[in-house]
């Protein structure tokens, strides 16, 4: 017993000294909430980090230090400081933390977790390849899949035959359950088209065991990457618990298997000697670009291509699908704005809305941005790591080398310096061109590569949905606006009642 007490007090002493030395290593060291040994500030952050961290951030004027176990973090929400770090001093703050690399693959593959010169070369490779497939055909495909999903709803939704007519035209309501699966299915379908040039119907996808397994794998993987799973890595004395990450990587192996099958099939089809070959998707384009630049493919490059495809599949599916969930929730809870958007779309005098119409839908665009501002999908972004020590903010704040950095997107969104009445939902807020844009897609060279296709999906799907249907909750009461935190933030899953417009 005496030995156990000695070890316990030794651990307390170790952490106390570690915290004190780090917090006092420079006269400009950051302030933050008082940590307790072993836990650091975990008990103050609580399980709702996306809600508590913005409150702490406001108290410390947009930048503070935080201890997660034995790991030192800097959290920043002040826009000027974010720009200074992520744009003006990008080279010092461009890398991801090691933990995130551990869970997404090694640092030589993909785009989400790689660092340094490898990230530079992969970013250049992806931009060359991505531009070749991001064209009008993709926007046409998004519209096609949106209309296909509407038809699927009408054929497979639950029709309320016994209730009275829901409108003066005698249209019956259609109940749509499992909305999350269908919204994610739409985005996953678009990703499969862009990455692998595959086009499958929603009927086939809804009945497909493989498709449901892909959907489940992505959600499980992202749920496993939330801050409280990562904390195991922060508590250095509990490193054996990191075996849990093996299970996370196992979940990713199913996606790796799919990428391998697609690559092996595609490499047999490509004629590298033909000048007439045209890339039909991202996979084609990646293969051809590397082959042209490097005069052939080696094993490491092949693994890199597959990892890039997996990164696009995961990131492009969950974030866009969750954004659609939030926007529809706010449309249901604010029917007066739903009607205003419909009138805006109706003035276009078109039976279907395309990406080219975005410039003529300012209120819808503002509604989307305001929802994104109040409910950012990645409220704490993905962690970065400083390479060298640096003093920022007009020589006010000292950032040590090898420090983990969190960009507090939610804190930025709730800052009165950026937005008037930031806690209020004002869908016309962004009609004023002087209002600051959101940070939902990041900032600087390492922002979201897929921003354009994501916003096109959101606009095309929502505009045509509103043009063709009125949306309600099943009981005509407001939908709950509870937040479920993983790597992204989603609302509580809900069902929808749709009524066809005439």
Swiss-Prot record:
Membrane topology designation: Single-pass membrane protein
Ranges annotated as spanning the membrane: 3-20
EC number per UniProt: 1.14.-.-
Superkingdom of the organism of origin: Eukaryota
GO molecular function: heme binding; iron ion binding; monooxygenase activity; oxidoreductase activity, acting on paired donors, with incorporation or reduction of molecular oxygen
Keywords, comma-separated and alphabetical: Heme, Iron, Membrane, Metal-binding, Monooxygenase, Oxidoreductase, Transmembrane, Transmembrane helix
Localization (cell): Membrane
Organismal lineage: Eukaryota, Amoebozoa, Evosea, Eumycetozoa, Dictyostelia
Similarity annotation: Belongs to the cytochrome P450 family.
Signal peptide: none
PROSITE patterns per record: CYTOCHROME_P450 (PS00086)
Protein known as: Probable cytochrome P450 554A1
This protein's GO CC annotations: membrane
């Amino acid at each position: 017993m005496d030995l156990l007490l000695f070890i316990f007090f030794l651990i307390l002493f170790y952490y106390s000294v570690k915290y004190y030395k780090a917090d006092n290593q420079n006269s400009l060291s950051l302030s933050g909430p008082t940590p307790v040994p072993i836990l650091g500030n975990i008990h103050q952050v609580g399980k709702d980090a996306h809600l508590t961290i913005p409150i702490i951030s406001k108290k410390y004027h947009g930048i503070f230090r935080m201890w997660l176990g034995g790991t030192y973090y800097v959290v920043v929400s002040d826009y000027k400081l974010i720009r200074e770090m992520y744009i003006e001093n990008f080279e010092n703050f461009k890398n991801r933390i090691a933990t995130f690399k551990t869970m997404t693959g090694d640092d030589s593959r993909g785009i989400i977790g790689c660092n340094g010169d490898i990230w530079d070369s992969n970013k250049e490779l992806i931009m060359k390849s991505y531009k070749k497939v991001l064209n009008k055909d993709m926007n046409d495909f998004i519209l096609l899949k949106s209309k296909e999903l509407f038809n699927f709803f009408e054929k497979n939704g639950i029709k309320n035959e016994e209730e009275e007519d829901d409108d003066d035209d005698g249209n019956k309501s259609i109940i749509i359950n499992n909305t999350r699966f269908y919204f994610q299915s739409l985005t996953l379908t678009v990703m499969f088209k862009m990455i692998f040039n595959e086009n499958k119907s929603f009927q086939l996808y809804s009945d497909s065991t493989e498709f449901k397994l892909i959907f489940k794998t992505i959600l499980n993987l992202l749920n496993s990457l939330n801050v409280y799973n990562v904390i195991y890595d922060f508590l250095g004395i509990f490193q054996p618990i990191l075996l849990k990450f093996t299970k996370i990587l196992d979940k990713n192996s199913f996606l790796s298997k799919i990428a391998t099958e697609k690559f092996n099939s595609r490499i047999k089809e490509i004629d590298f000697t033909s000048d007439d070959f045209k890339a039909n998707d991202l996979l084609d384009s990646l293969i051809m670009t590397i082959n042209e630049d490097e005069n052939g493919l080696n094993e490491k490059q092949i693994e890199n291509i597959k990892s890039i495809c997996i990164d696009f599949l995961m990131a492009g599916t969950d974030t866009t699908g969750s954004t659609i969930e939030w926007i529809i929730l706010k449309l249901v809870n604010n029917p007066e704005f739903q009607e205003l958007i419909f009138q805006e779309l109706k003035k276009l005098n078109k039976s279907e809305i395309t990406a080219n119409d975005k410039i003529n839908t300012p209120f819808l665009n503002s509604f989307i941005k305001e929802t994104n501002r109040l409910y950012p999908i990645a409220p704490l972004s993905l962690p970065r790591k400083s390479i060298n020590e640096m003093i920022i903010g007009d020589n006010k704040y000292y950032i040590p080398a090898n420090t983990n950095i969190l960009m507090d997107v939610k804190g930025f969104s709730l800052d009165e310096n950026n937005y008037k009445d930031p806690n209020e939902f004002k869908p016309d807020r962004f009609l004023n061109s002087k209002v600051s844009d959101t940070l939902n897609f990041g900032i600087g060279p390492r922002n979201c590569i897929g921003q354009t296709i994501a916003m096109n999906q959101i606009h095309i799907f929502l505009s045509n949905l509103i043009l063709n249907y009125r949306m309600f909750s099943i009981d005509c009461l407001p939908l709950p606006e509870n937040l479920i935190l993983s790597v992204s933030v989603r609302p509580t899953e809900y069902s929808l009642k749709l009524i066809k417009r005439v």
